Amino acid sequence: MAFPYPQLVLFGDSLLQHSAETLDGFSLQSALQTRCLRRLDVINRGFSGWNTANAIKFIDQIFPKPSDASPRIKFLVVLLGANDAVIPLPTTTQHVPLEQYKKNLDAIVNHPHILAHDPKILLVTPPPVDEIRLKELNLAEGHPCAVRTSAISASYSETARQVARDNPHVVSIDLWTAIMDKAIALTPDEYTEGGPLLGTPDNGNRGGLATLLPDGLHMNGDAYRVLYGLLKPHIGEEWVSLPVEDRTGYLFPDWRELAG
């Protein structure tokens, strides 16, 4: 009989798909796998370009019902919304209205196939965007304006927080605030507390977002390090403080046990 490893699943859009890559010397997926080595398999189910409507359409196929022969999902990290927040224009197709986004997120974190695994669900807010950089790139791509704005994207992040608040079994991971705080810390002279945010036309400065979000949307290695720092306290608490020789949680025995 096979003994499949429990899983930590990363479910979302390109922000999680790209977490498998090594960027600026850091890979989020690799860091999580190292933290969970021999105890959990880290599975990447990030789909570039997807919104919550796409996720709902395929969720039954992505998350099968648990069975004796299939792995149990112990942790589920969900990060969706960056594409839902795309402005509806003749040149765009990804927009999901805010209220529907909320319903979709709620349906995902309460899907019966997922709940049957009884995972710890970590719902990550979409990060901020650098609207100044996005406008440059989007105009060059033929769009009439930036297809994402800081204000609209922030409203989707707040909705993700609300979904977590509404569901006691869901943990909120506030990536939006953490990335913005990091960007401000990198360039404090370009932001005044209470004033327009970095990356907005009203501010006029990209600040630290220019480093953390090189194309205005996708994260660099330092931004993924921020996300790792947010996830880490919720994953592996039961073994990270153990002595190095303690193999609690290993699915298969340590070689010393076999040698004995």
Model-identified regions with their sequence ranges:
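Serine-esterase "nucleophile elbow" of acetyl-processing enzymes
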Residues: 1-54, 59-71, 76, 240
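Alpha-helical cap/lid subdomain in secreted, periplasmic
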Residues: 31, 57-260
